[in-house]
Amino acid sequence: MKIPMKLILLKIFQVVLFLCTVPAWGADFIPAITNYTVKDYQGAHQNWACAQGDDGVMYFGNNNGLLVYDGFSWELYKVPGGYIVRSVFVDKDKIYIGSFEEFGYFTRNVTGGMEYHSLSAKVKNQDAPNDEIWHIVR
């Protein structure tokens, strides 16, 4: 029985293609991770929450306030009273934060900075003094 030349060439091609992938088998996948220190972002040591906006900007609830990282630089925005930001939630152009007896949101102003708008006075049933907002849900 004679084997067609096309079939032989196809099998040789398959073996060569298979052997080309062998070096990739032993390669470990290591994601690109960058660790930042307190000196890098000029905040406190503890970060309590994080969220990412549609534009890729990262927001972190920190002991010193709201940290904003755009992939190149860090910005720190304080919350009135200097409280710890415990929760962060991004909804379009508003960055909601929860803190000690404080709830509100940041928005970008015309100069590119962030402005804080408190919603605490508008929250009903404020019968829980000395309470912190740990989670924000839609």
Q: Where do the PLM segments sit?
A:
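Carboxylate-rich, polar loop motifs that coordinate divalent cations or form catalytic acidic clusters
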Residues: 1-138
